[in-house]
Amino acid sequence: AFDRFVPSDWEAVAFPLVAALITQSEITVDNIDNSGSQGDSAIVDVLKSLGGNITNDTEKNSLTVRKSRLSTAHLPGGELHVNLSGYPDAICALAVAGCFTEGTIVMEDIGVCRKKETDRIEVMQAELRRLGAEVESGGDWISVHGHSPVLEDGSRNPEFVLHGGTVESYDDHRVAMSLACLGLGLPSGESVTVKNAECCAVSLPDFYAVMNKNKARFSW
């Protein structure tokens, strides 16, 4: 017999991180893999570059997100260009984060995303637009121009126009989880209904239940 640390799947960790950031909440994720062996861990650096208040406790293998306002205003050209060739599965979570970021995020070198469970570039563009987001795309890129729900002084941002609605998951687990998380960040009275949301079971069968233990408001 032997003891072995079983690390978290960074592709799964992305969703609670983004959910906390877009709702200006705090969450701690335990059992984090700090070995650098998973390319998707780079999403933390991307979120930090947007102003995400994220700390990594390497001794406890935990990651904590605190209340943050996401923006690209401090970046060159006022935009974030990120090459996702090493972790293309992050497209769904980052696209949702982009909807709540003051500025523009351009995700590049993601042509492979057109050959996943769905064409994730086309699908995310279509469903985010359905909810009021400004999204453009090309053969191997997608851009999201968003607005923070709050201004720098903490007051409500009148330019934040995302709204609720019914969206398709296309039986793609990452699409379903990302769009469900988007709904958490909408103003009171607005909600998102994801069709066939249970398709997330292919990778995270307890996703909604675990999120609800951390004060999400999912019903299914």
Question: What do the PLM-derived regions correspond to, one by one?
Answer:
Residues 1-220:
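Short, structured segments at the rim of ligand-binding sites
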